[in-house]
């Protein structure tokens, strides 16, 4: 067992409706990522900012959505717990924490055109069901 668990996946999928009736437009994260980079975005468990669980090494927008790659660190009790749950298949969701900068209504939907990305969490139930992670090492 290593001191870290490498994971990757999509934290957001463009033009895909989530369970809160939000849709994220392509490019919505570009300004935020240009300002903060991956290092400015925290890795949390269930959006709990009291105990970060790792670091995001890469966060990029591609044609599909917001791709993330990072390491869950076993140096903390919460990191060890989350890594074990991810390896067992009990946790595989990703969820974003953000501040809306620019959005528009489209019927019942809120289209997020520009957001300030604060964190990406490993979660049990993602608001966007397709936002999932995989273990890569």
Where would I find each of the regions flagged by the language model?
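Short, flexible beta-strand-to-coil junctions
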Residues: 12-16, 46-49, 99-102
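Polar/acidic, low-complexity leader/linker segments enriched in S/T/G and N/D
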Residues: 1-37
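Short, surface-exposed beta-strand/loop "edge" segments at domain boundaries and coil↔beta transitions
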Residues: 14-20, 49-54, 77
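Structured helix-beta-strand junction loops
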Residues: 36-39, 88
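Short, structured beta-strand-loop surface elements
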Residues: 44-64
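Flexible, active-site-adjacent loop/turn segments at secondary-structure boundaries
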Residues: 12, 27, 31, 51, ...
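Short conserved beta-strand and strand-loop elements enriched in small hydrophobics
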Residues: 39-48, 94
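Residue microenvironments linked to proteolytic maturation
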Residues: 4-8, 58-137
């Amino acid at each position: 067992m290593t001191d870290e668990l490498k994971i990757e996946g999509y934290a957001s999928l463009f033009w895909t409706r989530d369970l809160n009736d939000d849709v994220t437009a392509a490019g919505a994260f570009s300004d935020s990522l240009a300002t903060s980079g991956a290092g400015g975005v925290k890795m949390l468990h269930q959006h709990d900012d009291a105990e970060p669980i790792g670091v995001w090494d890469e966060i990029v927008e591609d044609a599909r959505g917001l791709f993330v790659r990072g390491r869950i660190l076993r140096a903390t009790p919460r990191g060890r717990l989350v890594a074990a749950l991810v390896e067992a298949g009990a946790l595989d969701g990703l969820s974003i924490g953000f501040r809306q900068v620019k959005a528009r209504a489209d019927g019942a939907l809120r289209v997020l055109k520009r957001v300030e990305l604060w964190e990406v969490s490993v979660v049990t139930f993602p608001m966007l069901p397709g936002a999932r992670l995989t273990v890569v090492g």
